[in-house]
Regions:
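Feature of Fe-S/electron-transfer and energy-metabolism proteins
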Residues: 1-575
Length: 575
């Protein structure tokens, strides 16, 4: 496409507007696509949108200038972003930024004269345990140093991931169960397996190179059809990444490089011997640990929600189905009524994991009782995780997106909702890709969309990307952003459960809350409520970053002390 051709640009915009049905709520998505194609928002494109969608040009400019992800001036071929969040700041992100500025000869917000590089900063990229972080065209590089900056920028090459496979379509709960039994032996055999962490944190340490090296090495030994190899979501122990776990003994190797892969395959996969030099060594006791669950970082955790992250390929819906995925949805559709679902969630004691800890069942009950003029209600997932040092939501969306999606569908059944949105930070490209892929797979499989599992229940979900405004994580600002308006909070004298998105009853929960729902429906309220304290049930996920020995993502029972988290799991404060 000739990007300087105004006619071609106008045609591109017209196609985008038509594809999005000229809906005001899709304005941000349209702007993102234009910027993806042209590296900025040309003035002509904004004028075309205003004409085609019959929106005042001032409103278009209002959205384009409010969100920091958008640019009205051309950007370079490669976008270099440096995290300046608290966790990266204490690890000298300022020095890294200065080095990039020296190397490129530009400052933040500027573009090199040859249009090769643009330099940007961001408050937090959610890979805090691997800081300081630099991102080039969406690829993360962690533990940056001046030497690494120069090496990466000199040799940078763009990488593209292969498109994931889909699944068959299920017309009933029985059909889903039949398929589950057929894929279990292939994806959950209990035999030899190799799990390579491919979450953002480990990707920053080049784990994708480790994964590819492992694939080639297994093939060279004729083991590619005998060993289950998975690129998984975040294992949590980000500071020691890239991580590789070899099953069924679950031997944990840390700081693995592509050069280590040959030894891991020859010694551990083939002969069952441990590669001592790659084991985790506790800095306090000097002890080395072979098995993942024995490592102090993991030993005191209770990974009810995060556990599957270490074994699932998030791009494969059959991995999720093989381990019980969407069984809770089938149960909610055919064995429970909406009131029963809400009652189960209430007896489990689930509270919101993203804000004030409001009882989830009470929230759902209010939204179910609320009247809608046309019967339309919404459920929303708030994944606009902007707090510095926080990356809990990112890891869940990247590593186990179907659990979040399944929770949302169950919530929609309980509330009587017809549409859902996942609002994700634009600074989380892997999370956006992961949840978008999960939605497409679920639709293809008959688990989302019209007549889910032949039940007659209809529900669809869309992804709405944030555009760099921290305030858009606030509930009413988030809804304004989805509607295509400037993401500013409104007065809260009217609850969003009564009058929310598009002035319809709306239920908003965060990523972690939704991920708890399938667990409750599958295992029952009593089992779930047996974890935690009398008033706070279940577990809570925390990002453990900054000046601490073991940084990463932890999941612990409610009621645990901060001292236990910092010292027993985190290994204490260095020095």
């Amino acid at each position: 496409m000739g990007k300087s051709d105004i006619k071609t640009l106008s045609e591109f915009v017209a196609d985008l507007v038509e594809l999005n049905n000229s809906e005001r709520s899709r304005l941000s998505a349209i702007l993102h696509e234009i910027q993806r194609e042209y590296n900025y928002l040309p003035e002509q494109a904004l004028r075309d949108i205003a004409t085609l969608m019959e929106i005042p040009i001032t409103d278009i400019y209002g959205v384009a200038t409010f969100y920091t992800s958008f640019s009205l001036v051309p950007k370079g071929l490669h976008i270099v972003t440096v995290c300046m969040g608290t966790a990266c700041h204490v690890r000298n992100s300022r020095g890294i930024l200065d080095e990039i500025c020296r190397f490129l000869g530009i400052g933040p917000g500027e573009t090199t004269p040859d249009m090769a590089f643009s330099l940007e900063t961001v408050n937090c990229l959610g890979a805090c345990a691997m800081g300081p972080i630099m991102v080039v065209d969406g690829k993360y590089f962690g533990e940056m140093s001046s030497t690494k900056v120069r090496r990466i920028l000199k040799k940078y090459q763009k990488e593209e991931a292969a498109a994931p496979a889909g699944a068959k379509r299920f017309s009933s709960a029985a059909d889903l169960e039949k398929h589950r039994e057929s894929v279990k032996p292939l994806r959950y055999s209990g035999g030899t397996s190799v799990y390579v962490c491919a979450g953002t944190g480990c990707q920053a340490g080049s784990s994708l190179d480790v994964l590819e090296a492992m694939r080639l090495e297994l093939k060279s030994h004729g083991l590619d059809d005998k060993v289950l190899l998975r690129g998984t979501g975040c294992h949590g122990f980000c500071e020691r990444g890239p991580l590789v776990v070899v099953g069924p003994e679950n031997i944990l190797y840390q700081k693995v490089t592509p050069e280590d892969v040959g030894e891991v395959v020859a010694e551990t996969v083939k002969d069952g011997r441990v590669v001592e030099r790659l084991l985790y060594e506790d800095p306090t006791s000097g002890l080395k640990f072979e098995h993942k669950d024995e490592v102090p970082f993991y030993a005191k955790q209770k990974r009810m929600i995060l556990g599957p992250n270490g074994v699932l390929d998030p791009a494969e819906i059959d991995d999720y189905i093989a381990r019980g995925g969407y069984a809770a949805l089938a149960k909610a559709l055919f064995d429970m009524d909406p009131e029963g679902i809400i009652d189960e969630v209430g007896r489990a004691g689930l509270r919101g994991r993203g804000g004030g800890g409001f009882p989830t069942a009470d929230k759902w009950k209010s939204c179910r009782k609320a009247r809608s003029v046309d019967g339309v209600k919404y459920v929303l997932c708030n994944a606009d995780e902007g707090d510095p040092g926080a990356f809990m939501d990112r890891c869940l969306l990247e590593g186990n997106p179907h659990s979040v999606l399944e929770g949302m569908i169950i919530g929609a059944i309980a509330i009587g909702a017809t549409h859902g949105y996942v609002y994700v930070r634009n600074e989380y490209p892997l999370a956006v890709k992961s949840i978008s892929n999960a939605i497409a797979q679920a639709e293809e499989a008959g688990l989302l969309g019209m007549d889910i599992l032949g039940s007659g229940f209809d529900f669809d979900v869309s992804v709405s990307r944030g555009s760099g405004a921290f305030v858009s994580g606030e509930s009413t600002a988030l809804m304004a952003s989805i509607e295509g308006r400037v993401g500013e909070p409104r007065e809260k004298y009217i609850h969003t459960a009564v009058r929310g998105l598009y002035v319809r009853p709306t239920n908003l929960n965060n990523v972690e809350t939704w991920a708890n729902v399938p667990l409750i429906i599958n295992e029952g309220a009593e089992q779930y409520a047996s974890v935690g304290t009398e008033n706070s049930k279940g577990t809570k996920i925390f990002s453990l970053v900054g000046k601490i020995t073991n940084t990463g993502l932890v999941e612990v029972p409610m009621g645990i002390t901060l001292r236990e988290i910092v010292y027993d799991i985190g290994g204490g404060i260095p020095g």
